[in-house]
């Protein structure tokens, strides 16, 4: 585990070279096809050296939940173990890790008709009105979900309309816990400035690699928009806004870097409260040896 730009992929590839393991990606951005540059997806050479499972598995127009990830990850883990190898889970989507290790509440699946109904209400009344609705039926969830978080707000309302039970009621029950023993590592630089510099350097490298053209191709499709989870990935939203003429190029670069730093901060907040973690320093020469020592 680790924040974005902390060196997770590089360390994982080295582990695959030294240890009989296979990588399972735990990243909510890498699941999307045709989103390669802005997600820092491992390139062809890296994937040839160390294939990553659960990368490029859905179209950007599709939805993919933490429950979907848990189901798919468990299947991949079972397959890897059946061949006598060790699964190596690598990524920074903490909600996926949490869902995998702790199980999930038995929430209803997505209902497109209900989602369209909620979206239409939001268009007509505004998200604040829908947040007021949620406060009436589920004040606990309303306290946790900001009116400016349409994805979580819509999901809370959808759950209630589909099941007749609130999100708070349903989340009191968890599904099966993780059936395997794990050794958990987190990698990050101890100096936040180092991480900030890495984030800035990487985003500027993405731009040099053609990130703007990548977003242009996605934007040219008629089925993608900024309300989709795929297009809310850091960098993509800001570049889309630049291509729409809402912001200039320099502002786009600044906003994307700031958004990525904020993502890293949230990831680190999760990790600081995570139990039983073995911490690694980004770029340290002994990281590989430390992982090998604790994994025996």
Curated annotation (Swiss-Prot):
Superkingdom of origin: Bacteria
One GO BP: tRNA modification
Site residues, Interaction with substrate tRNA: 93, 115
Pfam families the UniProt entry points to: IPPT
Region (Interaction with substrate tRNA): 27-30, 151-155, 232-237
Cross-referenced SUPFAM superfamilies: P-loop containing nucleoside triphosphate hydrolases (SSF52540)
EC number: 2.5.1.75
GO molecular function: ATP binding; tRNA dimethylallyltransferase activity
Annotated catalysed reactions: adenosine(37) in tRNA + dimethylallyl diphosphate = N(6)-dimethylallyladenosine(37) in tRNA + diphosphate
Keywords of this entry: ATP-binding, Magnesium, Nucleotide-binding, Transferase, tRNA processing
Binding-site residues for ATP, renumbered to this chain: 2-9
First-level EC class: transferase
Positions that bind substrate: 4-9
Needed co-factor(s): Mg(2+)
PANTHER family according to UniProt: TRNA DIMETHYLALLYLTRANSFERASE
Function, as annotated: Catalyzes the transfer of a dimethylallyl group onto the adenine at position 37 in tRNAs that read codons beginning with uridine, leading to the formation of N6-(dimethylallyl)adenosine (i(6)A).
Family per similarity comment: Belongs to the IPP transferase family.
Subunit structure: Monomer.
The name this protein goes by in its record: tRNA dimethylallyltransferase
Organism (species): Shewanella pealeana (strain ATCC 700345 / ANG-SQ1)
Gene name of this polypeptide: miaA
């Amino acid at each position: 585990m680790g924040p974005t730009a902390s060196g997770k992929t590089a360390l994982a590839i080295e582990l695959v070279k030294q240890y009989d393991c296979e990588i399972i990606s735990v990243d909510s951005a890498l699941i999307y096809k045709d989103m390669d540059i802005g997600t820092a997806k491992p390139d062809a050479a890296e994937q040839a050296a160390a294939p990553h499972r659960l990368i490029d598995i859905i179209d950007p127009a599709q939805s993919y939940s933490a429950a979907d990830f848990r189901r798919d990850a468990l299947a991949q883990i079972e397959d890897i173990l059946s061949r006598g190898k060790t699964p190596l889970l690598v990524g920074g989507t903490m909600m996926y890790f949490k869902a995998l290790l702790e199980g999930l509440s038995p929430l209803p699946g997505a209902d497109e008709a209900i989602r369209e109904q909620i979206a239409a209400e939001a268009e007509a009344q505004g998200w604040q009105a829908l947040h007021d609705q949620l406060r009436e039926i589920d004040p606990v969830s309303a306290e946790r979900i900001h009116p400016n978080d349409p994805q979580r707000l819509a999901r809370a309302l959808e759950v209630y309309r589909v099941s007749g039970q609130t999100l708070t009621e349903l989340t009191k029950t968890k599904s099966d816990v993780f059936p395997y023993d794990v050794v958990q590592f987190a990698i990050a630089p101890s100096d936040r400035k180092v991480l900030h510099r890495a984030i800035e350097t990487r985003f500027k490298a993405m731009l040099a690699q053609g990130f703007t053209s990548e977003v242009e191709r996605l934007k040219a499709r008629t089925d993608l928009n900024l309300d989709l989870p795929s297009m809310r990935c850091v960098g993509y939203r800001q570049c889309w806004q630049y291509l729409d003429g809402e912001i200039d190029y320099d502002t786009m670069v600044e906003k994307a870097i700031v958004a990525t730093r904020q993502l890293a901060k949230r990831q680190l907040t999760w990790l600081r409260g995570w139990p039983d973690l073995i911490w690694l320093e980004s770029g340290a020469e002994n990281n590989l040896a430390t992982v090998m020592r604790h994994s025996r």
